[in-house]
């Protein structure tokens, strides 16, 4: 059981890391593509999965996958979304405070909020992040980490589309197509996974029933 459990977690983590890496790498600019008929690629100095920048990507997305798995196990043992979100926010705040003290050691003015916009951004970020973490905790509690991971590319697609509509940002065709295809793939994988589990449970119950009849 332990070996099967570790294999399942390893597969989930690998799949989620692949989602993040593929979505990050499949960025090709779509600005003016309808007019010129060709896709304009991003500058060559964009970080890729090679060298120091690539190592940062791998570490970041691996830690995200591990965090989802740990979050799933915590929710199964202690099903309280708000308590988990509070603990998470306190730990993150303390960590950010220590990092900020180290980075801005010689710049005390960095701690001063110079406008109301900064305060509004801080409050909005706290509210949105806390709400999203509660929703994520609720999702992994009832659906598992795979279900949460398969919608992550769609969140990237949504952010890209809304940024292009309201902020005039570049729309990356790779993010739209790649995120959609990966999400469809995860949906199919999740459906097949549940079907396989159903057949496995049915076969197990059938075997136990036959054993009971023989006894």
UniProtKB/Swiss-Prot annotation:
Main location: membrane
EamA domain mapped to chain residues: 65-186
The UniProt record lists the keyword Transmembrane helix: yes
Residue ranges of the TM segments: 48-68, 82-102, 117-137, 146-166, 176-196
Family membership noted in the UniProt record: Belongs to the drug/metabolite transporter (DMT) superfamily. Plant drug/metabolite exporter (P-DME) (TC 2.A.7.4) family.
Molecular function (Gene Ontology), one example: transmembrane transporter activity
Organism, scientific name: Arabidopsis thaliana (Mouse-ear cress)
Designated name of the protein: WAT1-related protein At3g28060
Membrane topology, record value: Multi-pass membrane protein
Top-rank taxon: Eukaryota
Listed Pfam families: EamA (PF00892)
Keywords: Membrane, Transmembrane, Transmembrane helix
Listed GO CC annotations: membrane
Subcellular location per the Swiss-Prot or TrEMBL entry: Membrane
């Amino acid at each position: 059981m332990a070996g099967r459990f570790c294999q399942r977690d390893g597969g989930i983590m690998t799949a989620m890391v692949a989602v993040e890496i593929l979505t990050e790498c499949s960025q090709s600019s779509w600005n003016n593509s309808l007019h010129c008929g060709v896709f304009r690629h991003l500058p060559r100095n964009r970080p890729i999965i090679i060298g120091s920048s690539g190592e940062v990507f791998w570490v970041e997305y691996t830690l995200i996958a591990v965090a989802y798995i740990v979050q799933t196990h915590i929710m199964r043992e202690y099903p309280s979304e708000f308590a988990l979100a509070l603990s998470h926010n306190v730990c993150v705040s303390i960590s950010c405070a220590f990092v900020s003290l180290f980075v801005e050691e010689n710049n005390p003015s960095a701690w001063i909020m110079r406008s109301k916009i900064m305060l509004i951004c801080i409050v909005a970020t706290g509210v949105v992040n806390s709400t999203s973490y509660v929703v994520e905790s609720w999702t992994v509690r009832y659906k598992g980490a795979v279900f949460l991971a398969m919608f992550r590319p769609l969140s990237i697609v949504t952010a890209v589309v809304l940024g292009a509509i309201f902020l005039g940002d570049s729309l990356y065709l790779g993010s739209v197509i790649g995120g959609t295809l990966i999400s469809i793939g995860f949906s199919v994988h999740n459906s097949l996974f549940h079907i396989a589990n159903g057949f496995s449970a049915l076969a197990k119950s059938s075997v136990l029933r036959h054993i009971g009849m023989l006894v």
